[in-house]
Structure formats: C-alpha cells, structure tokens
Amino acid sequence: MTLAYRKIAVVGAGAWGTALAQVAASAGREVVLWAREDELVQNVNTAHENSLFLPGIALHKSIRATGDLAEAAEADALLMVTPAQHMRGVLEQLAPRIAEGKPVVLCAKGVEQSTHLLLTEVLAEAAPQAAAAVLSGPSFAAEVARGLPTAVTLACEDETVAEALTHAIGITTFRPYYSSDLIGAELGGAVKNVLAIACGIVEGKKFGDSARAALTTRGFAELTRLGLAMGARTETLMGLSGLGDLILTCNSPKSRNMSLGMALGEGKTLEEVMGARNSVSEGVHSATAVVALARKHGIEMPIAEAVARIVTGAAKVDDAVAALLSRPFRSET
C-alpha cells in the first residue's frame, strides 16, 4: 500500500458508487466495483453499463465489477458507497482483510438508525485499524458520471492521506477539496437529507419559493448548531459538504430526499413513495437518529423533529407544518 493509491475499490454499485467508479477510472486508477447482484456484475463487465441504477451512461471499459468482497479488499483504498443502514454489515465482512492504515472512504450520507452513530463511528467499531475518510458534497450521480463539473469535500484526520486521495480520484470535472474535519464533512451530508425532505414537502404543498428559502436557511441554522456542538468547524459547515450540499438537495427534484418530500406534500403516503423506488432516500432512516443526536447535545432542531414525526407516522404532514408555523416568534440568532 502506497500513498499513490493506484488501485481503488468501490464497494456498492448503485448510481453513486458507479459514478465514483467512473471518476476513478477517468483518473487513471485500476478500479474494482463490488456489487451484490450477479446480473449487475455481468452487465458492467460485458455491456459496460449499469442498466439497473445508472442506465444510458457508457462506463469506462477498464472498470471491472466483482461480487467478491475479498477481491475488493485487496485495493489500496476503499470507497464505501453502500447505504448507511447497511454499512456496518459490509464493513464487518471486510474488516479482517483491511490492513492497518488503509483508507476507507465513507461516501454514503446518513446516521446509523439503531445506534445514532455517525458512519465514521461505525467504522471505528467495525474496522478500527482503517484510516477513516469522508467524501461528501453537492453531487448528483448522473451528472458526475457524465463528466459534468462537480466539487466535493474529501476529509481525513491525516490531511496527508486526504490530499493523496484527492489526487488519486480528482479529475478536471470532479474536484475534491481536502480537509481534516471529519465530523463537519460527514454531518452536513447526513443532516441535509432530512432537511431536503422538509423542503420537498414545502414544494409539494405549493407554499412557494419564499417559504422554501426560509426553511432552507433555518434548516442550515439547525445543522450548524448541531455541527458546532459535535466539534465540527464553521468553515466546513459553510463549505461544499455542508451549505453546498444543502443548497443542491433542497432545490432540485432530482434529489431523492426532496422528491420524496414533494410526494408526501402532495398527499402520498410514505409506503406508496418508498414502494415505487429502487433507490434509497437516506433522510427517512436518518431523521430519528439526527433528532436523537440533537437531544443528546441539547440542540433544538424543530424542522428535523417535524420530519422525524412525519416519517415515523407520529404526525400527519399538515399537522407538522401547522406546529412549525405556530412556534413562538424569537431572535434569529
């Protein structure tokens, strides 16, 4: 293993994992893409396409898919793109084969629902010998895979590793900015998914652009309060993985979390929306965990709490909205 990170394994062949494999291949790396589905492995290796999760985009012929986690573990660095709620199980399978100090880059955005742990904390329990890193920022998989310009944050406590990873996967159209603030980079992505559901509800209810702007801004205040309480840096929360990701996710129906919120605002049930999808909306699973973190740190997050009540069935959309709008007037800061 060297800091050149010549061989990259992408663990998880959904849309985002496939897009990151495309980026790493474009950067000249040897890329192994792990998928659960045998038919998807065959699809990538023979047709050079991910017809299931990223159809219509031609993949680099150098990307090699595998269903063998042990093979993926042999890479110089691992990009973990499995859904947040399944991350622990995959990491535990990989752990015996992860060498001391090998970078494991967490690319999913969420908080473990059952434990309320950040994914870096999950990694510390499952594979403590790994060098934890986080990749997060305003990015849609299809745009990244097509080579449209995108910038993200890549954080690792060892900034030398973060910089080396940036050079390993960075290309002209995919620009990672490195940082040593793991908590800030990770928390922004997890919380914005919850807030995006709220913004989608605003859109679905046709409350207007002013209401969505207000909710996005007040939501960012919630994210910032929690982030600072947990040790994140202000500049990280104001950066790509925080404010940047929030702006994108709360303003585009292409966001899975915002589109889910829109459907809820239009009157659909959560079961109806989730049943019609083959992709994951992490905000649904992270909402209760984010609220638990806020309570643990004594932070008020009324928007996140409203989303948590909606997705758990504790409140109807209209009742949760009414409760937010009837909160007492207060100072902005």
Swiss-Prot record:
EC category name: oxidoreductase
Residues annotated as binding sn-glycerol 3-phosphate: 109, 137, 139, 192, 245, 255-257
Where's it mainly located? cytoplasm
For biological process, the GO terms are:
carbohydrate metabolic process; glycerol-3-phosphate biosynthetic process; glycerol-3-phosphate catabolic process; glycerophospholipid metabolic process; phospholipid biosynthetic process
EC number in record: 1.1.1.94
UniProt: NADPH binding residues:
16, 36, 109, 141, 256, 280, 282
Q: Which domain of life is it from?
A: Bacteria
Where is this protein found? Cytoplasm
Entry keyword annotation includes Magnesium: no
For the keyword Transmembrane, the answer is: no
Role summary:
Catalyzes the reduction of the glycolytic intermediate dihydroxyacetone phosphate (DHAP) to sn-glycerol 3-phosphate (G3P), the key precursor for phospholipid synthesis.
Record protein name field: Glycerol-3-phosphate dehydrogenase [NAD(P)+]
The uppermost taxa in this organism's lineage are: Bacteria, Pseudomonadati, Pseudomonadota, Alphaproteobacteria, Hyphomicrobiales
Q: Which gene is transcribed and translated to give this protein?
A: gpsA
